[in-house]
C-alpha cells in the first residue's frame, strides 16, 4: 500500500499529513514556530526554523501513520503565499529573515511606484493590485538593505524563493531551485498571460533575473528528496500556494465553481477557467494551478478579519471561554437586534481596500446584549463574503453562483453557514474533509505520479458533510444588507484625518 505525504507550511505552523487513496488522513503532525516583529507593521520568520519545524513534522506524521519513507508514493507542497526568502546559493544560508505576507514595511515603495503610474502596468500583466502584500517589493527591500546583497544577486550568488521554493531546495539538498505558476503569480514579477518572468516588471521592481527560480507546472515531478533525509528518494510532484491548493482540494475544477475558506481571514476564490479576467474592482486574478500544459485562473477576494472577530470577543472582551461557544450564544437570540459589527480592525480588504477604516459596532440600544453583539460578529463574516461575491458578479461575465463550497475553522459554525446561504441565495456546501489545503497539494502530487488517474477521480472523492439551503425572505435579506452597507459607510476612512491608528 502506498501513500501521499502533504507538506502544509502555514503562517503560524508547519504541518504534514499522510493521505491514502480514498483521501483519508492516516497521519498528522503540526509544530508552531516563532513570529518575529522587529518593529510595528513588520513581520518576519526565521527560514531555518521553518525548515527545521517542517522536517520534524514530516518524520512525525510518517511515524503517526506507522509507515516507512519507501511507502510514500509522492510528496505535495502547499505554503503561505508571498512570504519571501533570499539565500546564498553555495551555503543555502538565508541572508535575511523571511519577510511575511502580512509585513507592511514596503508600503512607501508601493506609494512611490503608484505615483509613477506603475500600478496600471502591474495590474494588466500580473492581475494584482500594487501592494506590499506581494513578494516583489519585499525582494527589492532585502537587496537594498542587506549589505552587498544587490551586487551578489547580480553575480548569481543568491537565490530568491517563496516558501515552496525554500522547502523544495532543502528537501532536494540544493539540487532544485524552482516554483510553480500559482506561487509565481503572487510575486508581481510573473506575466500571467505569457507565463514567464517579465523583463518590464523586473525592471520596475529592480529585481535581477539571476536570482529567480525555474517555473514549472503545479502537478509535475520537481525532483526527489535527498536520500540522507529519510533514507529514501521520494518524488516531490506537486506544489501550489495555500488558497489555490484548497480550491483544488475542494474539487472546484470547473469554470464558475467557488470556494470560501473561513479562517482568521476569509479567502474566496472562483475558478474562471483558461483565460484570465483582469478585475477593475480590486479583486485579484491569479493562476490557481498548471497541469497538462495549461493553466487555470481564479479570481480571489480576501477578507482581513473573519474568524479573528470571534477570537477578539473571546480574548479582548471575554464574552466566552471557547470560540466554539459563540454559536450557542448567538443562537440564544432570534436576530441581531439591530446591531451591526464591522470588524475593520486593520482596515477593510476586498472590495473596499480601505486601510483607514476601523472597527465599528453600531445600532446598540439599552436592550442589546452580548448575544446580539456575538450574532452581529458572526454575521459580519458572511456580509463581508457576500460583498466579495457580489463584486465578482460584476467582474465575471454571466456569472451565477450555483453553490459555495466551504472550509476552514469557522465553516463548522452552522449558524454562520446558514446565514451565508441566506445572503447569497445559493447552497452552501461543507465537505467531510475540511483539510482541503493539504488535500489539494496531495492530489496535485498524486496526479503527477499516477497514484490518482484523473481529475474525475478527484471529483469522485469529494464528499458532502452538510448542505445549507437559503430560506430567508427576500425583503428581510434586503433590509439586512441595507443596514450593513450603512454600517460599513460609518467605518470607512475613520482615521483618514487623524494622526493615530
Curated annotation (Swiss-Prot):
Listed GO CC annotations: cytosol
Top EC group: transferase
GO biological process, one term: glycerol catabolic process
Amino acids binding glycerol: 81-82, 133, 242-243
Binding residues annotated for sn-glycerol 3-phosphate, in chain numbering: 11, 81-82, 133, 242
Keywords for this protein: ATP-binding, Glycerol metabolism, Kinase, Nucleotide-binding, Transferase
Involved pathway(s): Polyol metabolism; glycerol degradation via glycerol kinase pathway; sn-glycerol 3-phosphate from glycerol: step 1/1
Activity regulation summary: Inhibited by fructose 1,6-bisphosphate (FBP).
One GO molecular-function entry: glycerol kinase activity
Listed Gene3D superfamilies: 3.30.420.40
Binding positions (ATP): 11-13, 264, 307, 311, 409
UniProt keyword annotation of Zinc present: no
Leader sequence segment: none
Pfam families on file: FGGY_C, FGGY_N
Catalytic activity: glycerol + ATP = sn-glycerol 3-phosphate + ADP + H(+)
PROSITE patterns from the UniProt entry: FGGY_KINASES_1, FGGY_KINASES_2
EC number(s) recorded for this UniProt protein: 2.7.1.30
NCBIfam families: glycerol_kin, PRK00047.1
Assigned protein family: Belongs to the FGGY kinase family.
Stated role: Key enzyme in the regulation of glycerol uptake and metabolism. Catalyzes the phosphorylation of glycerol to yield sn-glycerol 3-phosphate.
Protein name per its UniProtKB record: Glycerol kinase
Species of provenance: Borreliella burgdorferi (strain ATCC 35210 / DSM 4680 / CIP 102532 / B31)
Amino acid at each position: 500500500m502506498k501513500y501521499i505525504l502533504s507538506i502544509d507550511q502555514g503562517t503560524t505552523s508547519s504541518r504534514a499529513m499522510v493521505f491514502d487513496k480514498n483521501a483519508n488522513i492516516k497521519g498528522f503532525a503540526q509544530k508552531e514556530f516563532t513570529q518575529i516583529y522587529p518593529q510595528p507593521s513588520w513581520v518576519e520568520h526565521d527560514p531555518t526554523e521553518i525548515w527545521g519545524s517542517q522536517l520534524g513534522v514530516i518524520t512525525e506524521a510518517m511515524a503517526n501513520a506507522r509507515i516507512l519513507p519507501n511507502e510514500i508514493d509522492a510528496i505535495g507542497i502547499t505554503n503561505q503565499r508571498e512570504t519571501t526568502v533570499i539565500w546564498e546559493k553555495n551555503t543555502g544560508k538565508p541572508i535575511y529573515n523571511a519577510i511575511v505576507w502580512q509585513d507592511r514595511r514596503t508600503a512607501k515603495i508601493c506609494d512611490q511606484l503608484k505615483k509613477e503610474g506603475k500600478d496600471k502596468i502591474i495590474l494588466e500583466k500580473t492581475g494584482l493590485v500594487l501592494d506590499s502584500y506581494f513578494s516583489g517589493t519585499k525582494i527589492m527591500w532585502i537587496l537594498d538593505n542587506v549589505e552587498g546583497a544587490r551586487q551578489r544577486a547580480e553575480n548569481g550568488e543568491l537565490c530568491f524563493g517563496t516558501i515552496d521554493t525554500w522547502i523544495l531546495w532543502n528537501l532536494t539538498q540544493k539540487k532544485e531551485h524552482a516554483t510553480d505558476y500559482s506561487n509565481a503569480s503572487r510575486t508581481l514579477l510573473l506575466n500571467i498571460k505569457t507565463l514567464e518572468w517579465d523583463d518590464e516588471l523586473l525592471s520596475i521592481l529592480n529585481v535581477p533575473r539571476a536570482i529567480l527560480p525555474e517555473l514549472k507546472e503545479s502537478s509535475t515531478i520537481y525532483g526527489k528528496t535527498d536520500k540522507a533525509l529519510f533514507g529514501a528518494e521520494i518524488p516531490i510532484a506537486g506544489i501550489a500556494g495555500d488558497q489555490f491548493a484548497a480550491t483544488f482540494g475542494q474539487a472546484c475544477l470547473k469554470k464558475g465553481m467557488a470556494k470560501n475558506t473561513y479562517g482568521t481571514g476569509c479567502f474566496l476564490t472562483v475558478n474562471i477557467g483558461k483565460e484570465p479576467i483582469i478585475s477593475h474592482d480590486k479583486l485579484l486574478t491569479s493562476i490557481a494551478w498548471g497541469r497538462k500544459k495549461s493553466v487555470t485562473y481564479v479570481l480571489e477576494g480576501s477578507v482581513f478579519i473573519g474568524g479573528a472577530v470571534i477570537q477578539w470577543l473571546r480574548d479582548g472582551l471575554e464574552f466566552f471561554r471557547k470560540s466554539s461557544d459563540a454559536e450557542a450564544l448567538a443562537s440564544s437570540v432570534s436576530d441581531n437586534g439591530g446591531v451591526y459589527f464591522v470588524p475593520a480592525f486593520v482596515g477593510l480588504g476586498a472590495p473596499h481596500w480601505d486601510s483607514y477604516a476601523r472597527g465599528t459596532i453600531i445600532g446598540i440600544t439599552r436592550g442589546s446584549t452580548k448575544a446580539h453583539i456575538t450574532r452581529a460578529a458572526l454575521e459580519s463574516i458572511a456580509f463581508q463574503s457576500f460583498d466579495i461575491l457580489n463584486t465578482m458578479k460584476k467582474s465575471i461575465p454571466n456569472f451565477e453562483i450555483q453553490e459555495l463550497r466551504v472550509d476552514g475553522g469557522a465553516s463548522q459554525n452552522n449558524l454562520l453557514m446558514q446565514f451565508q446561504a441566506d445572503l447569497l441565495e445559493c447552497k452552501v456546501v461543507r465537505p467531510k474533509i475540511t483539510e482541503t489545503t493539504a488535500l489539494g497539494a496531495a492530489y496535485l502530487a498524486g496526479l503527477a505520479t499516477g497514484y490518482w488517474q484523473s481529475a474525475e477521480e478527484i471529483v469522485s472523492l469529494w464528499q458532502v458533510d452538510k448542505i445549507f439551503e437559503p430560506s430567508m425572505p427576500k425583503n428581510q435579506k434586503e433590509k439586512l444588507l441595507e443596514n450593513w452597507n450603512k454600517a460599513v459607510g460609518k467605518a470607512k476612512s475613520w482615521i483618514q484625518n487623524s494622526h493615530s491608528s
